């Protein structure tokens, strides 16, 4: 049976809606009070796992799920060995560098050498500054990275930004965008190659759904 890893949080509702367009119903995950982490499609064609966004590529890479939906930011950070198949065009956000609005920094090149950068996305941050040949110290944080510049622990942060409201409310401003991120459909490479459990047919249905959604907005 085909297993699909779905992300908890902001991407879940759109992920379920997309799969419904291909005849797979995992809407039980959205029911109030639901605590199930694994459910069958109502027609028992497939199974879904509800996992942390950052864990989706891990389940797919190791074969516990043949397909998964995950943000591109996670794929850049995790560098998992998975096949990236479709840009699903939802969950749009950007990986940005932000500083205190009152600071003198208005460009990443204004940042002093060996300054501190706070981030949950350590690999993305380190890779970006390495490519700029700008030596910095990456300070790993698990949450509320905005406090880095506010408390003086760091000169800047690297974090996901959707509307920018959280930054503004905390007196921060974006000075650079590393990359844009949207939800992606990923697959276990072996399962994709051998068309395990009819995976290719479902992928094509999802691709058509995304294409139709794009056409409807044009």
Curated annotation (Swiss-Prot):
InterPro entries: ATP_PRibTrfase_cat (IPR013820), ATP_PRibTrfase_CS (IPR018198), ATP_PRibTrfase_HisG (IPR001348), ATP_PRibTrfase_HisG_short (IPR024893). Coiled coil: none annotated. Pathway: Amino-acid biosynthesis; L-histidine biosynthesis; L-histidine from 5-phospho-alpha-D-ribose 1-diphosphate: step 1/9. Its EC number is 2.4.2.17. One of its GO terms (cellular component) is cytoplasm. GO terms for molecular function: ATP binding; ATP phosphoribosyltransferase activity. Its main location: cytoplasm. It catalyses: 1-(5-phospho-beta-D-ribosyl)-ATP + diphosphate = 5-phospho-alpha-D-ribose 1-diphosphate + ATP. It comes from the Bacteria. GO terms for biological process: L-histidine biosynthetic process. It is found in: Cytoplasm. Keywords: Amino-acid biosynthesis, ATP-binding, Cytoplasm, Glycosyltransferase, Histidine biosynthesis, Nucleotide-binding, Transferase. Lacks the C-terminal regulatory region which is replaced by HisZ. Heteromultimer composed of HisG and HisZ subunits. Belongs to the ATP phosphoribosyltransferase family. Short subfamily. NCBIfam families: hisG (TIGR00070). HAMAP family: HisG_Short. Catalyzes the condensation of ATP and 5-phosphoribose 1-diphosphate to form N'-(5'-phosphoribosyl)-ATP (PR-ATP). Has a crucial role in the pathway because the rate of histidine biosynthesis seems to be controlled primarily by regulation of HisG enzymatic activity. PANTHER family: ATP PHOSPHORIBOSYLTRANSFERASE, ATP PHOSPHORIBOSYLTRANSFERASE ATP-PRTASE. This is ATP phosphoribosyltransferase. It comes from Synechococcus elongatus (strain ATCC 33912 / PCC 7942 / FACHB-805). The gene is hisG.
């Amino acid at each position: 049976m085909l297993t699909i890893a779905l992300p908890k949080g902001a991407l879940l509702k759109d992920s379920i809606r997309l799969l419904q367009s291909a005849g797979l119903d995992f809407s039980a995950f959205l029911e109030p009070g639901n605590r199930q982490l694994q459910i069958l499609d109502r027609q028992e064609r497939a199974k879904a796992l509800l996992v942390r966004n950052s864990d989706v590529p891990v389940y797919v890479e190791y074969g516990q799920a043949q397909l998964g939906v995950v943000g591109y930011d996670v794929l850049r950070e995790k560098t998992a060995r998975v096949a990236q198949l479709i840009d699903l065009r939802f969950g749009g956000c950007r990986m940005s560098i932000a500083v205190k609005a009152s600071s003198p920094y208005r460009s990443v090149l204004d940042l002093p050498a060996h300054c501190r950068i706070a981030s949950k996305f350590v690999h993305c941050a380190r890779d970006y500054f390495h490519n700029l040949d700008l030596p910095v110290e990456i300070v790993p944080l698990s949450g509320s990275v905005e406090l880095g510049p506010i408390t003086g622990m760091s000169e800047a942060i690297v974090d996901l930004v959707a509307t920018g409201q959280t930054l503004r409310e905390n007196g921060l401003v974006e000075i650079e965008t590393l990359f844009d991120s949207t939800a992606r459909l990923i697959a276990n490479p072996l399962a994709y190659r051998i068309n395990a459990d009819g995976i290719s047919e479902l992928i094509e249905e999802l691709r058509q759904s995304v294409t139709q959604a794009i056409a409807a907005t044009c």
